Amino acid sequence: MASGFEQPDIDFLILGDRVEAVNGKLYMMGGAWDRLNVVDFNQPVPFGFAVGILIPWNDANEALPLTITISGEDGEKITPDLQTTVSVGRPPNAVKGQSFRAVIAVQGTWKLPKPGTYVVRASLTDGRKEVRFYAVPIAHPQ
């Protein structure tokens, strides 16, 4: 049965406190938030994000360019673009015409210059997905 779409597509982009992709599965702790509490904007803060990509049958075994950016509300990037390629093969037991999902997890520490709105954006060929989050100051825990 055909997958119903012809182009690779970003299925999801999700933020998390801790993300990891192992053997095609996503492991996440503290996921799907849109508010990040920051004690000190002079220090980098840890968080990650996961990208799920649906790849149609005809694009299996192709290297697809993926670019991820993190920017502030003014559009200024807080880190250089993260660039990679995504490729999935067809396993021997694949159903002809099926789509395949690739999962990418990026964990890091990021320097957010000030309180405000930030955008994580993933771009793949013609598709794009973005998620906004709000960095807010909090008092240092006692």
Give each language-model segment a name.
Residues 2-124, 128-142:
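Contiguous segments within soluble domain cores/interaction surfaces
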